[in-house]
Amino acid sequence: SLETGRYLIHNGNNIVSRNLAEDRSLNPKRIVLLEPTDKIQLTWIIEKSGDEYILNNRGAPTAHIEDHVFALLIHQEGATKWSIEAVPRHGRNAYIIKGSDGKGWVAPDKAGEQIIYRTLIVGPSEPPTFPLNQVFQIIKLE
């Protein structure tokens, strides 16, 4: 299991984070897939809470609102407690991220689009396999 700390979250070569440019409102901010760039390190603070995790991006905890993932600037008590499950068959640091209803994070088809929250597809193998758009690399920063 992951310990509380600073992490990067990727899907394949793309970075998962809030947009660098956002409106100034207090509305929930979209969590999106971004092109890889070495100019920025978009750090997540992952807080372990029992068997679940609060995922904070740029100071704001995340939640699913309907079928997408957002960062909450206000009403942060509404943050989702996520379960993060290792999927070692997909490599080191490979995980799926799920809510309590069994749905989970799914990367969109292209960079710039928002992380989707929906029922996960599980391959009928032992151990199970997952489509790569459901597998996220969570890398601890020292």
Curated annotation (Swiss-Prot):
N-acetylserine found at: 1
Alphabetically ordered keywords of this record: Acetylation, Protease inhibitor, Serine protease inhibitor
ATP-binding listed as a keyword: no
Noted pH dependence of activity: Inactive at pH 2.0, activity is restored after 10 minutes incubation at pH 8.0.
One Gene Ontology term of the molecular function aspect: serine-type endopeptidase inhibitor activity
Residues spanning the signal sequence: none
Keyword ATP-binding: no
Function: Serine protease inhibitor. Active against beta-trypsin and alpha-chymotrypsin with dissociation constants of 0.35 nM and 40 nM respectively. Inhibits factor XIa, but not other enzymes involved in coagulation and fibrinolysis. Does not inhibit subtilisin, lysyl endopeptidase, arginyl endopeptidase or papain.
Protein's name according to its UniProt entry: Serine protease inhibitor
